[in-house]
């Protein structure tokens, strides 16, 4: 894992340009993507301080045939597009902290993943559900802090 300072330098210096071209295709947006990643890392540092982190990209998608896997019994044809959400993520013991864009921070204790009526239909409940599902299926979960932007 690299530090946020090292990660930012990789993007600002152009060392990650080949990766950015591979993900986003459009050469004309290279400067924009470099700055976008640097800004996301800076925001992560403002929220959580400097330290080791990783970067993840979740591509957007477009449905070509079918829509919503839950309505189609998993039978849809989708394609990824070169728009995405990126997350800057660092490890944290026992707690999950997530900030998405300008939304307030969500904080979840890994010791409290039970369903709560007052949390239903919230982003917090979705995150808790994924974590609980991983744990219930034998997966190992750990705490993290993340800043996400799209």
Could you say what each language-model-derived stretch is?
Residues 2-150:
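ATP-binding N-lobe of GHMP and related small-molecule kinases
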